[in-house]
Amino acid sequence: MAKAIPRRSSRRNGRIGSRKSARRIPKGVIHVQASFNNTIVTVTDVRGRVVSWSSAGTSGFKGTRRGTPFAAETAASNAIRTVVDRGMLRAEVMIKGPGLGRDAALRAILQSGILLTFVRDVTPMPHNGCRPPKKRRV
């Protein structure tokens, strides 16, 4: 019969404290994806590494309330609160999608005190690409 391999504790391999909070981010990029059902706000550094994120669903809104402007405003303020504590002063904003939370999220970003260098709409638009799905008959 095979000899049992003794299990070693994985504590020695794991990190004891989180090292993410030590990094200071003076400039970043705020990505807002506003769909009709939800709004997702992701804050990255200039290289594209995610620093903080939040969505209307993680902010406590469920169902159809996730698509509301108030939910988008709450999600944006939750995502930005952590990066303001880390020292973010300037940011670029990339807004994607047709949802109701576009303007509300931008309003929450402006109220946070971060200086915006530019706001860009990066909603993907087809140059007559794929055929769209057929119209709904309700």
UniProtKB/Swiss-Prot annotation:
Name of the protein in question: Small ribosomal subunit protein uS11c
InterPro entries reported for this sequence: Ribosomal_uS11 (IPR001971), Ribosomal_uS11_bac-type (IPR019981), Ribosomal_uS11_CS (IPR018102), Ribosomal_uS11_sf (IPR036967)
Subunit organization: Part of the 30S ribosomal subunit.
HAMAP family, per the entry: Ribosomal_uS11
Family annotation (PROSITE patterns): RIBOSOMAL_S11 (PS00054)
GO CC annotations on file: chloroplast; ribonucleoprotein complex; ribosome
Subcellular location: Plastid, Chloroplast
Organism of provenance: Ipomoea purpurea (Common morning glory)
NCBIfam families tied to this protein: PRK05309.1, uS11_bact
Chain residue ranges for the region called Disordered: 1-23
Major place of residence: plastid
Molecular functions (GO terms): rRNA binding; structural constituent of ribosome
Family of the protein in this entry: Belongs to the universal ribosomal protein uS11 family.
UniProt cross-references to Pfam families, sorted A to Z: Ribosomal_S11
